[in-house]
Amino acid sequence: MTQDQLKQAVAQAAVDFILPKLDDKSIVGVGTGSTANCFIDALAKHKAAFDGAVASSEATAARLKGHGIPVYELNTVSDLEFYVDGADESDEHLNLIKGGGAALTREKIVAAVAKTFICIADGSKLVPVLGAFPLPVEVIPMARSHVARQLVKLGGDPVYREGVLTDNGNIIIDVHNMSITNPVELEAQINAIVGVVTNGLFAARPADLLLLGTTEGVKTLTR
């Protein structure tokens, strides 16, 4: 199977998992990226089975609306049963690195609200230790140099992601060469740096369920 086929398989598995639990009042949280796009496309075939969605980015909102799925602002939603999103890396404890698509802050907010966070990924994303994928950090633009210096003190090699602005109007610094053995601690340390909006570690609030696309089929991992 190609990587695209694996993504489509896990996206369909996520739809199959949540569909029996949805009703006409249900609102689904939806992530950002190529795997999340596969989920949106699969979910759209069942749009009559639920009320609408909360999007983690402008790009996701546009794709949902393109399928005729109503998109709600998170502040107007009192109950979010599911959040479905991809990941750049996951460890066996379902701690994640996310933010390759620069939507990490809104993704983290929607994940925090949802009762169940379902991560969908192809098998290459499961790693023994996080950090081979550069860790994205969303930063207030004027704090870029200060934050970079602090990230060096934490052992990282920060690289400014040129030409990228988040939906919130901020910049991204990608932190290379980190072996993240304590993701909960590092997430808190980076978030404590003045000028950081948030970072791409999803460890304080990890995924509840990981659907992993492999050549042997979709595997399910739980915490």
UniProtKB/Swiss-Prot annotation:
Q: In what pathway does it function? A: Carbohydrate degradation; pentose phosphate pathway; D-ribose 5-phosphate from D-ribulose 5-phosphate (non-oxidative stage): step 1/1
Query: Which Pfam families does the record cross-reference, listed alphabetically?
Result: Rib_5-P_isom_A
Task: Name the residues annotated as catalytic in the UniProt entry.
Answer: E107 (proton acceptor)
Q: What catalytic activity does the UniProt entry give for this protein? A: aldehydo-D-ribose 5-phosphate = D-ribulose 5-phosphate
Report the transmembrane regions from the record: none
Sorted alphabetically, the keyword list is: Isomerase
Disulfide pairs here are none
Family in the record? Belongs to the ribose 5-phosphate isomerase family.
Q: What is this protein called?
A: Ribose-5-phosphate isomerase A
Q: Which organism is it from?
A: Pseudomonas savastanoi pv. phaseolicola (strain 1448A / Race 6) (Pseudomonas syringae pv. phaseolicola (strain 1448A / Race 6))
Q: Which gene encodes it?
A: rpiA
